[in-house]
Amino acid sequence: MIQIQGAVLERIGAPRPYSESRPISVVDVELDDPRDDELLVRIETAGVCHSDLSVVDGNRVRPVPMLLGHEAAGIVERFGDGSTAERDGVRVGDRVVLVFLPRCGHCTACATEGLTPCEPGSAANNAGTLLGGGIRLHRHRDPIYHHLGVSGFATHAVVNRASAVPVPRDVPPHVAALLGCAVLTGGGAVLNVGDPRPGQSVAVVGLGGVGMAAVITALTYRDVRVIGVDQLPEKLAAAQALGAHETYTPAQVAAAGIKAPVVIEAVGHPAALETAVALTAPGGRTITVGLPPPTARISLSPLGFVAEGRSLIGSYLGSAVPSRDIPRFVALWREGRLPVEALVSSSVRLGDINEAMDHLADGTAVRQLVDLA
Ligand SMILES: NC(=O)c1ccc[n+]([C@@H]2O[C@H](COP(=O)([O-])OP(=O)(O)OC[C@H]3O[C@@H](n4cnc5c(N)ncnc54)[C@H](O)[C@@H]3O)[C@@H](O)[C@H]2O)c1
Ligand SMILES: [Zn+2]
Ligand SMILES: [Zn+2]
């Protein structure tokens, strides 16, 4: 067991601003030793994603207290079985990307090449445990729940081997961290589901970390136009700076009657999905990656889908197999075609995590990184 420092969400649904209500406290936590199929990782950096905020504001109800953070990278310090050499392709000292849905590799969902989220992995995430059901985080013997098998807003984490993908050392920690959620999710939706043809356009609704990752991934395709849609002018300007060919607010894109064969919704609000559906061209695909509250509903014309041969597809974790797809993103980044670092707005200290949640909720940041090194 070691003592670590971590950002623990104590209660759900605290009023804003979080800088005053302070629902997350940075505290000393006991971290148990890793078990056989687990790793101890020293966290270097962790990104602040809307899926963290959704736990804080109660849109996605999870058990508390929970140590948040699910987009992180760090260095492997120890294996659960005590070995120090290579194990399943990972060595002590390797930099690993932590991914927020472990794939068990054995269930029927795991046989779908990434299209369906792993069943035991999803069950563990919902229960706030590691894959296999364990909880390694405690405070005075009381359990602290894991966030999506990672809990990366901390100096160290114990994760299942299936939650870690090694990357070469030339991939810096801030790039590695973003590969684990924003890039895998937004980029994976483009590579694995949208896969635009030359001459087609890709529209992205919602230009936060996930949507911007979809934008930069779509820009890696030759002869593909990229359209960014967000309600905030600053986000439209940021997407243009990254190379988006056209940008619009939801009202502007509706008024202009624009249609695209591949449309990605990365907001997590029903109005944004309605915008995305209306933007989809005949024969096209609306790919939804946003995570609204479970009670959210949208209004759709079924006839529109049939008469125009359109489809609506949900994509979790970018429909990715992380061990297959993270190297694809690393290769694009190394070729200079995927500017992942451009998604970083600022670095914050662990103690400023409540303020970081306010910035994310206000829409004033793309990706903030919590620096733990
Ligand atoms: N499917 C997955 O595996 C997965 C993984 C990570 C995140 N997510 C979800 O993806 C969504 C985006 O995450 P993020 O971290 O990029 O969030 P974010 O808060 O950084 O970005 C959301 C963006 O949407 C914009 N927006 C809000 N309402 C809008 C509207 N009606 N129309 C157009 N734009 C609007 C905001 O201005 C903001 O720029 C969240 O719901 C998150 O929980 C899903
Ligand atoms: Zn995320
Ligand atoms: Zn599985």
Language-model features and meaning:
Residues D32-A46, N59-A111, T116, A124, ...:
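Glycine-rich beta-strand-centered segment in the early N-terminal region that forms part
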Residues R95, T155-H156, A162-P250:
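Mid-domain Rossmann-like dinucleotide-binding core that forms the NAD(H)/NADP(H) cofactor-binding site
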